């Protein structure tokens, strides 16, 4: 499978955005409760795809695995940009 030189479009449904945000919040709290550094663990999962970065505690592992990692990254980028005053469409 090769790469193309043309730009590919990616679109996430608005309903999924809210659910991803809620899931990340719940996973963050579960990681925190277990004594992990939530940011490091979530980054580890997103970069590697290895669900072992997220514990089964409070069903956090199953919750985060409902979404593709690229969907999670899109939501994180959108949230960051909006928080910095950029009107993201």
Swiss-Prot record:
Pfam entry (one): IreB
InterPro entries associated with the record: IreB
Ranges in a coiled coil: none
Family under the similarity heading: Belongs to the UPF0297 family.
Name of this protein: UPF0297 protein SUB1776
């Amino acid at each position: 499978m090769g790469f193309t030189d043309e730009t590919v479009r990616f679109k996430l449904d608005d309903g999924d955005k809210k659910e991803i945000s809620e899931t990340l919040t719940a996973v963050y709290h579960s990681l925190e409760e277990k004594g992990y550094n939530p940011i490091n663990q979530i980054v580890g999962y997103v970069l590697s795809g290895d669900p072992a970065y997220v514990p089964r505690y409070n069903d956090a592992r199953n919750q985060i695995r409902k979404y593709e990692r690229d969907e999670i990254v899109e939501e994180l980028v959108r949230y960051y940009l909006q928080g910095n005053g950029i009107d993201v469409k």
